[in-house]
């Protein structure tokens, strides 16, 4: 710095999902301070923070080829996760790891999701209040991107209009669906109510509860397939996600 102070930081290149060959900034992380007060974290001056992310894959897998995408708030977290899990998951090297460098922006999320909807999205943000909010925002943006792939026809429009922005496609007004789909949803709903009743009663054997849960899940799968067919949604674009969290009491992965 101009005042003579020197710092040693790790720098992680930021790229835009549609052009990972062009570096648009740097995510910077410093060493932990000796007094335990934390460490420097930020982005290099001039970085494209609204669109740029750290995108990495040990096997050089591209976003469009990936079957698994792992989302983190920092590159440190992504590396820590890989070190913790790679010995027991040899395919992990084929995954793509993403760092948003903090609060994920709409442009960051949409840039990745539009190229990787068929992949399973692993949401690995921190477990503090900010991380919980980031996870919620990513889920909502995923639902928006899925919705954007559907052609709105006169037959589909009433139901699609009933789905609140940022919500799952199954959260619309079921009464606006064709008769067969309403019936299919009714089977799932009845199975769900039975499973919840069995769990809460304390009177049912775990094997019986598991059997009823399997029936419930099978009925939902049948309904979801029918919903996709009605909406003209390609199964590959019906994005899925899983929330992964570090072991308590750790709030992050490093």
Where are each of the predicted segments found?
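Glycine-/acidic-rich phosphate or pyrophosphate-binding loops and their flanking alpha/beta elements
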Residues: 38-66
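TOPRIM fold recognition
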Residues: 85-254
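Short active-site oxyanion
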Residues: 65-69, 121
């Amino acid at each position: 710095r101009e005042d003579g102070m020197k710092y040693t930081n790790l720098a992680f290149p930021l790229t835009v999902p549609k052009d990972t060959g062009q570096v648009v900034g740097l995510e910077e992380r410093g060493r932990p301070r000796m007094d335990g007060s934390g460490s420097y974290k930020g982005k290099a001056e001039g970085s494209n923070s609204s669109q740029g992310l750290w995108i990495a894959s040990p096997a050089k897998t591209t976003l469009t080829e990936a079957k698994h995408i792992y989302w983190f708030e920092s590159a440190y977290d992504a590396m820590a996760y890989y070190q913790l899990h790679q010995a027991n998951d040899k395919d992990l090297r084929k995954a793509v790891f993403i760092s948003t460098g903090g609060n994920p922006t709409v442009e960051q999320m949409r840039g990745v999701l539009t190229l990787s909807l068929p992949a399973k999205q692993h949401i690995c943000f921190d477990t503090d209040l900010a991380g919980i909010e980031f996870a919620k925002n990513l889920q909502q943006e995923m639902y928006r991107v899925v919705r954007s792939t559907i052609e709105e026809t006169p037959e589909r429009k009433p139901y699609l209009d009933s789905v609140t922005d940022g919500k799952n496609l199954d959260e619309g007004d079921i009464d606006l669906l064709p008769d067969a789909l309403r019936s299919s949803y009714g089977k799932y709903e009845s199975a769900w109510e039975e499973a919840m009743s069995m769990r809460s009663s304390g009177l049912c054997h775990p094997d019986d509860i598991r059997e009823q849960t399997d029936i419930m899940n099978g009925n939902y799968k049948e309904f979801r397939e029918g919903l996709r067919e009605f909406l003209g949604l390609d199964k590959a674009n019906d994005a899925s996600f899983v929330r992964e969290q570090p072991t308590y009491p750790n709030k992050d992965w490093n």
